[in-house]
């Protein structure tokens, strides 16, 4: 398999922004995080990362398929130092891309990071394999609320890596008031040419459904037809349908409002105090990104060792300091400062979260999302 080993210096989007900030990397409302490892330029391994990992008997190699800006600054090097196993990391931008890459067969990945609804989609299709919990003792660090989940009861196929919520990232100086509704993005010409929407079909259609007062899990073919017409009407006002880089468009001033994940905007806010994030009043979609082993993984023992390593408390803390997403790792969260735990972008207010839902994979609807969005893009 043609794989490229990615080092943090190779990543040119928001992770490189964070690294370039040095001591000031976690500023504004996240300022207190600067003292807890990432700030101050500490490049050393996390204490939990230094313990040696017993050899698995496999060749010292692991192929990791991950989202961009979604790992700690030294995590991969720390794992190599602890285990002797080198990690080759490739990047994907959407779950659709991940699924397409694996649909015809695993090209050689050992660990992948699908979202919850794609775990539901891939497990019945035999695309991911059951995990051996005996090889993942750090599972004990996971908050019990994330163990027996509807999309993967008992965590047979996946380990939780992060959880996240979609909302609106915006430039405060460019809006008349806080855009606390989906309307400016979905149903208005107020910010013509200054908005960007996600390009993942299912997420976008489900969020339009929330705007229309629907559950993300109750859309019908008639709803899809209605939403498709709305999207086509709105398309002339949309600057871009982005993949995993909406925060970059906002940061560069190319757009003023963007549909993005809270962690991505939290990262951007560390260097730009004119940026903020809101979960719209109609509610939104929650996601949980997970660690899975795809069928045909060439190094399954190394994969288990790597997943277990990522669930270590200190390792998880270092990852969380970098990516600024909510963590389901209770042991790691306990090590984080109050500035992280109490940040309303990373952990939105309870009133906003009460109207948010996890999306379920619906095999009857997924083709409709994709076909309708293809027509929208072509219109």
What does each of the following model-derived ranges do?
Residues 47-121:
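Early extracytoplasmic/lumenal segment of secretory-pathway proteins
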Residues 294-354:
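Mature extracytoplasmic/periplasmic domains
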Residues 350-379:
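Conserved C-terminal helix/tail region of periplasmic/extracytoplasmic solute-binding proteins
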Residues 1-13, 23-31:
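N-terminal secretory signal peptides
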Residues 36-46:
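Bacterial lipoprotein signal-peptidase II cleavage site
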